[in-house]
Amino acid sequence: MTARRDFTPALGLRVLTPFYDQAIAAFTREGTWRPRLVRQLAPSAGVRVVDVGCGTGTLTRALKRAAPGAKVIGVDPDGQVLGKARARARAEGLEIRFVEGFFDEAFVATRGPFAAVFSSLVFHQVPLAEKGTILRMAFAALVPGGQLHVADYGVQAGGLMRFLFRNTVQRIDGIEDTEHNARGVLPQLMREAGFDPVQETDSIPTPSGAITLFRAEKRGSGETI
């Protein structure tokens, strides 16, 4: 899990990492969409929940506060931001396991299965093929009836949202990986990974473009890892 692989650091550049939380607060209206994402699923005591690409752990901590009895794990390949995540969880007295590494077969085999997989602001940063890989891994990692919950940039409808997205997110993270999100690829990729139903539950206009909330379910008795 700690083998070196490429990943996009917070805000796209390592030099910007110290300003990540301030930028997210200022440009994404996280005070609006994060609570809505958490309310999509209130985990029960004892269930296992993973936050994929947890970063500094803002969503991870919110999940634990919402469901103190749940077993919450955050995974991220960036050790620098995980240091902040661990320190903040300790300061709040929250028992959260943070793992440095990738959400891959090795992680799921040793940490899963999960009742819920959460992810926020990750998919727009990764190539199209990796978006699909992460979603297939999420499907395999979930127990039957488990749910995937995602907050990320979705369709940028209208000139204003396109303009804002182009001049913030795409200036920082580039066009190649982000444009697929802006054209609405995530629901299709979720269905291709096996999720059904797939719902777009909300869309929040922000200074950096529209952020969409998704909820998708793993039905039946499909394979878990």
Where do the protein language model's features map onto the residues?
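Short glycine-centered segments of the SAM/dcSAM-binding site in methyltransferase folds
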Residues: 48, 145-147
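C-terminal alpha-helical "lid/dimerization" subdomain adjacent to the S-adenosyl-L-methionine
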Residues: 4-7, 151-193, 198-212
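C-terminal lobe and adjacent flexible extensions of AdoMet/dcAdoMet transferase-like proteins
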Residues: 213-225
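A short SAM/SAH-binding and catalytic strip from SAM-dependent methyltransferases
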Residues: 116-129
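A short glycine-rich, Lys/Arg-flanked "PGG" loop and its adjoining helix->strand segment in the class I
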Residues: 132-144
